[in-house]
């Protein structure tokens, strides 16, 4: 079995973040990174905006910092787990973001890395700690080539371990390290200086850090700017010119500011209020800090954040009464109320601050209301301080959530609970959905019988002015839009036809013409540009007697009519008059659909015609001898009748022909008007219902020029990087459900449309008004007959696959409604606006989800543990339909959150062969509480819940599972099969003891005959439940695995994950299955067969054959995240195959797709191999080009210059290599950033097997067209660029 792996939602625990001007000298960007990928955000305005795509790293990122060049541009310094140190800069081409390597050095990866390596950069050097014994310096010279010199290695002092490292940015080549002498147990503060002349790292001074109290230890250091600039005397003698850097050291109870020369030692205690409020077992730690130089260099702002969430401001100023010696104060600044432990603070020069938190849901963007006063009281905490206010809050999937709940598979929807505040009884629910949310602005019921709508906006109008409603009773209703109101409009007589005919088409033509096409006639009405209600009849046209108009299509100057006698009528607008061309071609079959290229500036050269013989013909509209040729230039045969057509211009003489078919399939063909060639680029079966309408909506998500703060001269600076938004065309497809086809980041997608009440839309048209922006707004008719005005503001794409809808639900006893917290529909890009006064401190809880369907109500039971030491948890019930809380009975009361007097470990739900639902809740004390539950119909509560009994087990229980009419309870190395008794759970049967099993942590069942158990040490075992009610262990794994999750894929196949970040598939072979079947699962016969076939091996190695059979390893893959759960979905969003979803502890959502056809496997394998070898291909090819260039220069000197060779070199280097080359040659790691060995990474703990890495395949999509062409030519000559892109997008569009 071959699987294709894709990460749909990347890890969200951002362990690294750095700020800098990465894309321009005066820009404000922030880089955030997990262990596996890098993201870039623009902070120019008050809302952060994501720039380009993610940079995926196929290794673990250990350290990240920035180094600034002489032009004020920031470069990234990265250190990977593979031992590679890389300096790179960002390059933005359109919407494609790349990291271009400038320097690469490989350290000895065999060095013991007991302590996490650290990287800090100064202006002209980079300092790295690698292993326990080494410090490495990389000299940097921005004015010379090569800029980065060979690293210089230095040994640490004996028995010394580097705990913290920082760069003194105001002093070139100066560093400070906080080190621990492991022998003497002494903390040391070392000032280091890299001497360029001596090429040596010098220890300029060292201090032992001591405290009078045992529990007051140094744990943090940070940079302080050059205090001499701010009038502080940093030396004893004014005459000395030697620089004296300062550094801040954080202890558990105070901070200490020391200088390099040892002259000053300034100590500031933390406020007593904080120290007294700390729990006995908690120490105060400084977890983050940042420094911002104020405008005009008038001062600096240095903020510290503690693990309690408090922000402190450090003030250092000269003592004018004592020779300007420094005075330091530690002042309370403010508190970030819902983030107590951030990993980084970032202060930007536009007066804002970003807090990055690794172990929390939220990353907060704040605004400075004030930077405080130096004369404030610094001894106490002032809870009324309001120096900062929250601008927005960005919510991620909880990095340590134990599970997600799969709500539905059409559209693909997950539910994730955010932190809850137990005092306010509120919860935050994140609905993560792979769909295009249609944001609803207005919804209004319409008269019964509306079958179609048309919106009208002429060239003279800025907004749409009329909506035409087509009724099934052969009438037409006109609605007028004015001043953001819609009302019925009755025009003057002898203009529009409103009765006794069915309107099939209404549109504008030319500057001021409106055409209305009915079954029995069409009319052209002229509109006065000065008076929107002054209509004038210009033309009436009637078909021949006994003939009706079946369909019509028009653009700015052309109108095509399809008649019931199979004739096509062509009319062209000239001088506000529609002129009919005499020739009317007659087709052999009934015309079902028409399409013209709708371009306001050009005439369409082609006409697409669908006919009842399952054909689509593309006819030429070229005028020959004053007649339309109607020559068939392209045709396509279909499997069913084409029901709707649409043509959209793609530029460069290319058009896309969209085809909706009666059998529910949807196709997109690319037509080249230069040679009239046609190629299919997308095909998807969307259901069984006919695709009745294809509607085009222009969506403009492009961000206009972003404004920066004024510079020092008062002039505002504009961000020139305008290419960060998106402008595209959305084709809305109406069938069984509503879908949308669109292009995003140069790739084509098709995703379902989502409406909150799951309404199906019949048709959709463009719409705009004075209060609704036209970019992405639309007017739709729902199947229930209501008019819906809404808009698009999020389109899923490879780099942002899910939208997020944050919903706040009130769980207090006096509230029963769900309150929406606003649509954060942009997934991970846009932020959610928040009211600071409503922010509460959120905790991280362990949750279990359980789907419960009873009496037509689909709900989710949510069990939540507190993170404190109290033995309690809570249960709440969420209605899947509207994400609202449901009431539960609790001691005769109706509550939304039921308290349970224990912590929950696992849950199970079953009827156990009765009519009554039983809920089994396993506590952490190995007690199972059995509840009887049912959905109430008496209106008092939504769910009635009654405790039946509780059963305690002696040995620790980690999981439970319902099997047949029994509850499986693992006890040490065997399984107990229990049934519900009157006073406790009763043992119905006991499974056999499994000798090699130590601790059963997970369970899964297949149908009524097989059980899989996962052991924390000894992998997976497969058990068989025989017809004689015996349980036999029939197979196990040959490897030891620390299993965290398992799931049956079929009767013989199990997928699982372990704590080392690997996913694997185990299977019982077909041959072994045949043996089991022949033995009828009889234990005696199986033993005889085992002795007969494998007796010799059993005698030699009895521990190997401790079961009848062994599970074969079918697939193995490293995902770099611990899997907490799997879901197997047969049909997801009209996919053509089942999908395996997995959820990771760091917030990952991924999938494994089975590849069913050999051609799929070979294509995707070739793409994977091309990208795996891309770095090698790039480097070797360009080394060859370097040699050619050298030969060329030598030949030029000898006047033997070959123009042909020059042409090849110029083409190869000038178009591709020229932007990436350096004077020292081409840098390795062009495509994988950290130059990782992909196979080694995906085989981190075990060799990868039968899994194609879709993540590395999709990095091809983020390359520029030049790089794509170059790589395809040299690494995969059998493929072409278009084929590769279509193959990758087919996976996204058809498989998921």
From Swiss-Prot:
Keywords: mRNA processing, mRNA splicing, Nucleus, Spliceosome. GO terms for biological process: mRNA processing; RNA splicing. GO terms for molecular function: nucleic acid binding. One of its GO terms (cellular component) is spliceosomal complex. The keyword Transmembrane does not apply. The keyword DNA-binding does not apply. Its main location: nucleus. It is found in: Nucleus. Belongs to the RSE1 family. Associated with the spliceosome. Involved in pre-mRNA splicing and cell cycle control. This is Pre-mRNA-splicing factor RSE1. It comes from Candida glabrata (strain ATCC 2001 / BCRC 20586 / JCM 3761 / NBRC 0622 / NRRL Y-65 / CBS 138). The gene is RSE1.
